[in-house]
C-alpha cells in the first residue's frame, strides 16, 4: 500500500483518497516572469514522478498545476522591457513548456491561469469579509486578519506569538496586525492598466495567496487529496492558503501536503533572489540560446541526464547541485543505457512478480522513494550485463518508463554528444570504467548517506557501482573495501 509523508501531520501515512480510486491533486506552479531554473526542474520532475506512480498504481488522477500570471515580479519585468503583461507571460509560459517537454514532464490534466479566476477570488474575499476574517485597510487593500484564524501555523509549526513583525512578513502601516497579509491590492496610478480589475473594493488585483485557494477549490473541490509544492511554499504561501480556504468554507483544504526538498548550491538554496541559479535551458540546450525564442534545440542525452539527476534522489531530501554531480549522473545513466545496448529488451512490459520489480514497487510505495527504485534499475542492468538476459533488459526498460527514463534508442542516445561525460568523446562509446578516485568518492558518498540514515541512497550507490563492475565489501568499523568484478 502506498504511504506518503504528510507535512501537515509530520508522519508517513497510508494514502486513502477521499473517493476510492480517484486522486485530486493540486500543485503550485510557476510565476512566469523568467526562465525556469534547476530548482524549478526538481519540483516539476518530482511531482511528475508522483502522478506517474499514482497512475501506474491504477488510480485515476486529476492533476491540476496552476500558473501565476499576475504578480509584482511580472509587472516589474513588463515595465523594464516595455512589454504588455500578456506578452511577458505568454513568452515565459511557452519557455516553461519547452523545458517540461525536454525533461519528459507530462502536462498536468489542467493548467489554470490566475487571471482566469479573479471572480472566484473576489467571492472568497467576500466570504472572508462577512466572517470577520478580512478587512478593508486605509490604503485601499483588503487584508486577511490572521489572528482571527485559530489554526494559523498548523502546517508550518509556526506560532503567531513567536513570529516577529518584519522577519518573515512585511509590515504595512495600514495593517491592523503586522502579520496580516493582502488578499486584494488596490491599484496604483503608475501601474499598467492591464494589471487592474474592477471589484467591490475598487480597481486592483489579487494577492498571490488567494489565487491558489480559488483555483484549487473551483477545479477540484474540497478537500484535495494531495496539495504539493516547492520547499519555500510551506510558509507563508501554503499556510495562508489554508487560512483563506478553511476560513471561507470550513473543513480541510487538503488531506495530504507534500513538499519537495530544495536544490542546494554551496549550502544555499538555488534561487533567483540569491543569484546562484542556472536555468534548465542553459544546462541541456544544444547550440546557442536566444532571449527572443522560447523554444530551443535540446540535447536529448543531457536532458535525460538532468531528469535522472533529480529522480535518483528522494524528493524530500535536499539535493546538491555541482557540475561534478551532473557528470556523475551522466555516467550512471550511460551505464543503464549500455546495458540496453548490450542486450536487446524482450518488450514484454513489467512483470510485477519479478524480484526487482517488487523491490521497485516497494520503494515507490514508500513515499515515492525513487532513489530505491533506481537501485532496482541498476540491479537489472547488472543482471543483463552478466547474463545477457532479454527479460532483465526488458524489465529495465519497462520500469525505467515508469520513472520517465530509458526510452531512447541506445545507439542514438550514445550518438548525442554530452558536456557531462568524458566517455562521450567518442560517438557510441560505452561509459568508461571508473578510476580509483571516482570509486573512492562514490564510497564516501555512500558512507555519508548511511550516516544520514538514507539507506535507499546508499543501496542505490552500491547498485550503480555493481553495474559498473565494482563490488563493495563492508568491514567492521565502517571500513568499505572494493574490487573490480
UniProtKB/Swiss-Prot annotation:
EC number(s) reported in the record: 6.1.1.16
EC primary class: ligase
Binding site for Zn(2+): 28, 212, 237, 241
Catalyzed reactions per annotation: tRNA(Cys) + L-cysteine + ATP = L-cysteinyl-tRNA(Cys) + AMP + diphosphate
Residues that bind ATP: 272
Swiss-Prot/TrEMBL keywords: Aminoacyl-tRNA synthetase, ATP-binding, Cytoplasm, Ligase, Metal-binding, Nucleotide-binding, Protein biosynthesis, Zinc
Stored SUPFAM superfamilies: Anticodon-binding domain of a subclass of class I aminoacyl-tRNA synthetases, Nucleotidylyl transferase
Keyword Nucleotide-binding recorded: yes
Family statement drawn from the similarity comment of this UniProt entry: Belongs to the class-I aminoacyl-tRNA synthetase family.
Subunit structure and binding partners: Monomer.
Protein name per Swiss-Prot or TrEMBL: Cysteine--tRNA ligase
Organism: Bordetella parapertussis (strain 12822 / ATCC BAA-587 / NCTC 13253)
Amino acid at each position: 500500500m502506498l504511504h506518503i509523508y504528510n507535512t501537515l501531520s509530520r508522519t508517513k501515512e497510508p494514502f486513502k483518497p477521499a473517493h476510492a480510486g480517484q486522486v485530486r491533486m493540486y500543485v503550485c506552479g510557476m510565476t512566469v516572469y523568467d526562465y525556469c531554473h534547476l530548482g524549478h526542474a526538481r519540483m516539476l520532475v518530482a511531482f511528475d514522478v508522483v502522478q506517474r506512480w499514482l497512475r501506474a498504481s491504477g488510480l485515476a488522477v486529476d492533476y491540476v498545476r496552476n500558473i501565476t500570471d499576475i504578480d509584482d515580479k511580472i509587472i516589474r519585468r513588463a515595465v523594464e522591457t516595455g512589454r504588455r503583461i500578456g506578452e511577458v507571460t505568454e513568452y515565459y509560459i511557452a519557455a516553461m513548456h519547452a523545458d517540461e517537454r525536454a525533461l519528459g514532464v507530462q502536462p498536468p490534466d489542467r493548467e489554470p491561469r490566475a487571471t482566469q479566476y479573479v471572480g472566484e477570488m473576489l467571492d472568497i474575499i467576500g466570504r472572508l469579509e462577512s466572517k470577520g476574517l478580512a478587512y478593508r485597510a486605509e490604503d485601499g487593500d483588503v487584508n486577511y486578519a490572521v489572528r482571527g484564524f485559530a489554526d494559523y501555523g498548523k502546517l508550518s509549526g509556526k506560532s503567531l506569538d513567536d513570529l516577529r513583525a518584519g522577519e518573515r512578513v512585511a509590515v504595512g502601516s495600514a495593517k491592523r496586525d503586522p502579520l496580516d497579509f493582502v488578499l486584494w491590492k488596490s491599484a496604483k496610478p503608475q501601474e499598467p492598466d492591464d494589471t487592474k480589475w474592477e471589484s467591490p473594493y475598487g480597481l486592483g488585483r489579487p494577492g498571490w495567496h488567494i489565487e491558489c485557494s480559488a483555483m484549487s477549490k473551483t477545479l477540484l473541490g474540497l478537500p484535495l487529496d494531495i496539495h504539493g509544492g516547492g520547499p519555500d511554499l510551506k510558509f507563508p504561501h501554503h499556510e495562508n492558503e489554508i487560512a483563506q480556504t478553511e476560513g471561507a468554507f470550513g473543513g480541510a483544504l487538503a488531506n495530504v501536503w507534500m513538499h519537495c526538498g530544495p536544490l542546494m548550491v554551496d549550502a544555499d538554496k538555488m534561487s533567483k533572489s540569491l543569484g546562484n541559479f542556472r536555468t534548465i535551458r542553459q544546462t541541456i540546450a544544444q547550440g546557442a540560446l536566444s532571449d527572443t525564442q522560447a523554444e530551443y534545440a535540446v540535447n536529448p542525452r543531457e536532458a535525460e541526464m538532468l531528469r535522472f539527476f533529480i529522480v535518483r534522489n528522494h524528493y524530500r531530501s535536499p539535493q546538491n547541485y555541482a557540475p561534478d554531480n551532473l557528470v556523475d549522473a551522466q555516467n550512471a545513466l550511460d551505464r543503464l543505457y549500455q546495458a540496453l545496448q548490450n542486450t536487446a529488451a524482450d518488450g514484454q512490459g513489467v512483470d510485477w512478480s519479478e524480484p526487482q520489480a517488487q523491490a521497485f514497487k516497494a520503494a515507490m510505495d514508500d513515499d515515492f522513494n525513487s532513489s530505491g527504485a533506481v537501485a532496482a534499475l541498476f540491479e537489472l542492468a547488472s543482471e543483463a550485463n552478466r547474463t545477457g538476459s532479454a527479460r532483465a533488459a526488458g524489465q529495465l526498460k519497462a520500469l525505467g518508463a515508469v520513472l520517465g527514463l530509458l526510452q531512447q534508442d541506445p545507439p542514438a542516445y550514445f550518438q548525442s554528444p554530452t558536456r557531462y561525460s568524458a566517455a562521450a568523446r567518442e560517438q557510441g562509446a560505452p561509459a568508461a570504467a571508473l578510476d580509483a578516485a571516482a570509486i573512492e568518492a562514490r564510497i564516501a558518498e555512500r558512507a555519508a548517506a548511511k550516516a544520514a540514515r538514507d539507506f535507499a541512497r546508499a543501496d542505490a550507490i552500491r547498485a550503480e557501482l555493481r553495474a559498473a563492475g565494482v563490488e563493495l565489501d563492508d568491514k567492521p568499523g565502517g571500513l568499505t573495501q572494493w574490487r573490480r568484478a
